[in-house]
Amino acid sequence: LTTPVRRRVRQFLPWALASIAAVFAILTFVWFVNPPTVESEAAQPTDAVVVFAGNPARLETAVELMENGVAPYLVIPNGNTSDVGTNLCEEQASFEVFCPDTEEISTWGEAQEIGRLALGRGWSRLTAVTSVYHVHRATTLLRRCYEGEIEVVTPQRDIDSEWVGKVGHEWIGLLASIVLYPTC
């Protein structure tokens, strides 16, 4: 490269990198820190509450929603893979619990199974429960498999010391879902 071209590249490069970093920071905030969700107390009635696998706080939030009468059905894909989930799947509750096994133990597998179940039962409105950092990827995949309305509730702001690693995982998972799972 000639000297004037190099000079222009050196002048442009910091601005380009700063712009990319700014876009990345904004998307991270909107998608993984402050996504659109509803407080559990304000959740509207839906056909079912669906839980994406993860920490016990998600299941506790889902049970709270069920006890508040948000929906008649609770869906816990791969629910028998955790102690709390197994208890809900095997014990009698005041609401009906579905614990389907998925073909793939992943957010995509869960979205597929939730979509199949919702279609088969004629559900048109769901309440999805997941962690705040997982909302964007979970709803992106669920919308590929389910055409109805989705309201999202998260456990009380569950951002903790491991949050940075979780957001990194979600970025990788989101990019993988775009490439590997473009459709349901």
Predicted regions located by residue number:
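N-terminal type II signal-anchor transmembrane helix
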Residues: 2-40
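A structural signal for short, hydrophobic/glycine-enriched beta-strand patches
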Residues: 32-168
